[in-house]
A protein has these predicted regions:
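Anionic-ligand binding region
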Residues: 90-94, 105-125
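Mobile beta-alpha loop/short-helix "lid" or hinge segments that flank ligand
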Residues: 20-33, 106-114, 146-158
């Protein structure tokens, strides 16, 4: 089994490296990451991860398996992705300040024949109230514009603002590595037990 890690995220590269499983990085530009408007919020990252995996199918060798992921921050029923501007990042942090939110990461695993699996892991996170000065300092010093919800739990803001979490810390960073490891172990034992993707079926009626 040869793992293809299909992500440009340095955090996911770092996390997967910690599993001591050899991998190569492969990137395809321009994958459509949109999702249907009626999709339940917690299924969104799983749906997007599956779309990413399916885009790699034709490039996979018989002994390769591609791993894709997508992370979103959920506040109430609102989804926060990556901010597109400093103003949007600031608005996101104001929205997270002093309240609970959820971080959901969807992961998809697929071989060349189209068989695979996908799942979503969710972690609950509680933020302390953030002052205007703290938000401005974080944005100015850490530029978190490549992160869902405009923050990285492993950075300064995680030390000073996160009161508690419930679930996987690494999931908040972008990859639930314990579940990834368990799934890859099952794949090595018998990949024929896996089913064709997609698993998240959208009813367009």
């Amino acid at each position: 089994m040869k793992v293809v890690l299909a992500t440009q995220s340095p955090r996911r590269h770092e996390l997967f490296s910690g599993l001591d499983i050899p991998f190569t990085i492969r990137l395809i530009e321009g994958i459509d990451e949109s999702y249907p408007g009626g999709l339940p919020v917690h299924q969104i990252p799983q749906y997007i991860a599956e779309r990413k995996a399916l885009a790699y199918q034709s490039s996979l060798a018989e002994d390769e398996v591609v791993l894709t992921a997508d992370t979103v921050v959920i506040v109430g029923d609102k989804v926060l992705g990556k901010p597109h501007s400093p103003e949007e990042a600031k608005a996101m942090l104001h929205e997270l300040s002093g309240r609970e939110h959820q971080v959901s990461t969807g992961v998809a695993l697929m071989g060349a024949e189209g068989r695979g699996t996908s799942f979503v892991a969710t972690t609950r996170v509680w933020f302390a109230p953030l002052s205007e000065e703290q938000i401005d300092y974080y944005l100015r010093s850490y530029h978190p514009y490549d992160k869902a919800g405009a923050y990285g739990i492993q950075e300064w803001i995680g030390y000073v603002a996160i009161e508690k979490i419930e679930g996987s810390f690494y999931n908040v960073m972008g990859l639930p590595v314990h579940l990834v490891y368990q799934t890859l172990q099952k794949w090595q034992v018998c990949k024929k037990n896996f089913v064709p993707l997609p698993i998240v079926i959208v009813d367009n009626k």
